[in-house]
């Protein structure tokens, strides 16, 4: 007869319907929800949610699911469990899977006292939200400018796009300094690369996106002068770009250059008259300018108002 043998533990019963992905049944997998696209590459940085469980325990001993935005982890560097590395390499974007890791692929014969007992098989539920393959980008950026010039333009554009994707991820995590570094790497690649006239528009389009990212990032870093610089570079490429005009307006407002801020924001509003952010920024500008003029009037009033004490002295 089929079915589980009497006396088997929950993990033993579960293991019978799981796929062996290590070849020695040290890492077993059960797909809960299928993913899509390519498998995770060996040098990828992954964005995952995970929870680790001991047998007979309902609460996880380890989990990152409480974080609003999990941090990006690079395979081979940031992940300490061999079983998790192997498991992730079998996954696709959007996949949710359950894994059993034998001690060899988890915490070994000693365990991790007092949390993990010796020789313990652990269960992990892992959801692969996304992954970015930085190996190609890292290798390319390490080359000299002369070596990079030997590659076709599409290669440069792909690497620059990867750097920008990393920057976007770091920006969403509010790691603005790290995001800036990635964006600058992308921009340097695009600045160094010459293209034939018929393909120059591809380079300019890629530059525009990165310049807008840099302008916004420097606003977040509270460096409006630099934000304005990158915004104006974006306007050289596309002088009517509403987002570039908006960023320049924001930067000028922070610098208390109210007339310049108004000029940029009015142009942005002409391009996108129903844009909520632009209209709100114009209201903010009006409020800031009113406060500024009120303070100026008050200061002038104090400077030129007659002094009662002096008047009294003059009368004596």
Curated annotation (Swiss-Prot):
Superkingdom of the source species: Eukaryota
Alphabetical list of PROSITE patterns matching this protein: FKBP_PPIASE, TPR_REGION
Limits of the PPIase FKBP-type domain: 43-132
Name by which UniProt lists this protein: Inactive peptidyl-prolyl cis-trans isomerase FKBP6
Disorder this protein is connected to according to its UniProt record: Defects in FKBP6 may be a cause of stallion sterility due to defects in acrosomal reaction. Disease susceptibility is associated with variants affecting the gene represented in this entry.
Molecular function terms, GO-annotated: Hsp90 protein binding
Chief place of localization: cytoplasm
One of the GO biological process terms: transposable element silencing by piRNA-mediated DNA methylation
Subcellular location field: Cytoplasm, Cytosol; Nucleus
Function: Co-chaperone required during spermatogenesis to repress transposable elements and prevent their mobilization, which is essential for the germline integrity. Acts via the piRNA metabolic process, which mediates the repression of transposable elements during meiosis by forming complexes composed of piRNAs and Piwi proteins and govern the methylation and subsequent repression of transposons. Acts as a co-chaperone via its interaction with HSP90 and is required for the piRNA amplification process, the secondary piRNA biogenesis.
UniProt record similarity statement: Belongs to the FKBP6 family.
Alphabetized PANTHER family for the sequence: INACTIVE PEPTIDYL-PROLYL CIS-TRANS ISOMERASE FKBP6
SMART domains: TPR
Keywords: Cytoplasm, Differentiation, Meiosis, Nucleus, Repeat, RNA-mediated gene silencing, Spermatogenesis, TPR repeat
Native species: Equus caballus (Horse)
Tissue: Specifically expressed in testis and sperm.
TPR-type repeats, residues: 160-193, 208-241, 242-275
Pfam families: FKBP_C
GO cellular component term, pick one: synaptonemal complex
Quaternary structure and interacting proteins, as annotated: Interacts with HSP72/HSPA2 and CLTC. Interacts with GAPDH; leading to inhibit GAPDH catalytic activity. Interacts (via TPR repeats) with HSP90.
InterPro entries, alphabetized: FKBP6/shu, PPIase_dom_sf, PPIase_FKBP_dom, TPR-like_helical_dom_sf, TPR_rpt
């Amino acid at each position: 007869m089929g079915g589980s043998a009497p006396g088997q533990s929950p993990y033993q019963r579960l293991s019978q319907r799981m796929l062996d992905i290590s070849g020695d049944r040290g890492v077993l997998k059960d797909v809960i929800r299928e993913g899509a696209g390519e498998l995770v590459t060996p040098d990828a940085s992954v964005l995952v949610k995970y929870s680790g469980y001991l047998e007979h325990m309902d609460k996880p001993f380890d989990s990152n699911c409480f974080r609003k935005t999990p941090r990006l982890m690079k395979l081979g560097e940031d992940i300490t469990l061999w079983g998790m590395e192997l498991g992730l390499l079998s996954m696709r974007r959007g996949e949710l899977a359950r894994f059993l890791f034998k001690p060899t692929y988890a915490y070994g014969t000693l365990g991790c006292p007092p949390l993990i007992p010796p020789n313990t098989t652990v269960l992990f539920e892992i959801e692969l939200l996304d992954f970015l393959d930085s190996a190609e980008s890292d290798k390319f950026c390490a080359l000299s400018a002369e070596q990079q010039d030997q590659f076709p333009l599409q290669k440069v554009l792909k690497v620059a796009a990867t750097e920008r994707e990393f920057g976007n991820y770091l920006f969403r995590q509010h790691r603005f300094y790290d995001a800036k570094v990635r964006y600058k790497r992308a921009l340097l690649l695009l600045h160094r690369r010459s293209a034939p006239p018929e393909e120059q528009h591809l380079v300019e389009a890629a530059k525009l996106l990165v310049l807008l990212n840099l302008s916004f990032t420097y606003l977040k870093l509270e460096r409006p002068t630099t934000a304005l610089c990158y915004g104006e570079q974006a306007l050289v490429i596309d002088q009517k770009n509403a987002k570039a005009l908006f960023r320049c307006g924001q930067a000028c407002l922070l610098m208390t250059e109210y007339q310049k801020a108004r000029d940029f924001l009015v142009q942005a509003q002409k391009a996108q008259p129903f844009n909520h952010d632009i209209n709100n920024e114009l209201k903010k500008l009006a409020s800031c300018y009113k406060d500024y003029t009120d303070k100026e009037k008050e200061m002038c009033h104090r400077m030129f108002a007659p002094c009662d004490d002096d008047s009294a002295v003059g009368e004596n």
